[in-house]
């Protein structure tokens, strides 16, 4: 067992205001996920972030990026075969230097960077890459998970918690077969999640006791993790509820996309009436968590490009309004791409030309509404 002194008072030792009944210990950061290192296969991401993109974000008033990384992206190993446990610590420093450069570029534009292991040794919410072990079950996977966080914490040990945070693991869930995209998920047992989060946090704070650590909600980011409340770890929720709107016709979520009913907001969809009340209920535990002194941020949110645009905006306006009323920041999933403000590929948007990109001005205005 690790004492809660492990934390070093990271969330409350900064210049941020102390939590009160109506405040959130974390700043209300707003911004985007950048997917430059999201794929386990280097070179497969076409939409690389440039300094100009970062400048646009800052000019539009945003102050946050989340960097979801797949650990195989920055390893040296034989990619003609599945990865082996002995490969998992073979860091390719040419690639990690690129990641570091993107972090420092973002800092030059006043953007906080939250590093995230979207694919960690032994776990990812997405299939498509064969893991050699299981993070929730195998000690070797846990040790390698901590190795990676030790590496990143050492890289950024002199960077202030106001500029960088460490988001441990994207969307934890218990899935028996991690190589089946549509296998049933459930919550990770609380004690198991605590043990993993505590070990990684210890590795991160060994380099700087004031490092800001964030843990995604359990059950694919949806539910508060009471088992972590005493560890001085912030928690990250999601802005994807209900999935019938956010992931309408998303093939990686639903096997038979043609069976999905047309989304409405508000309105009756299948056997449910969808309205703001549903969101108020969904976010209530997260709001209460922030009122109890645990920092809360919405690390991912948005809508796939098959949802009718006006339905998306109507729903998202409610999501963002609830978050803002309780001082909870957010990061849209993507800056450019099917969830993004640029080049989203929607069939029902009157795009504005923005230096050769297609800008969804209505979405941008909604995101900027409370900046």
Go through the PLM ranges and name each one.
Residues 1-15:
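N-terminal export signals
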Residues 43-58, 145, 279-286, 316:
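Short, acidic/polar
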Residues 41, 73-95, 121-140, 174-185, ...:
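Surface-exposed, active-site-proximal loop segments in enzymatic domains
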Residues 49-72, 286-289, 326-329:
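Catalytic domains of carbohydrate-active enzymes, especially glycoside hydrolases
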Residues 127, 135-274, 280-304, 325-331:
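Active-site region of glycoside hydrolase catalytic domains
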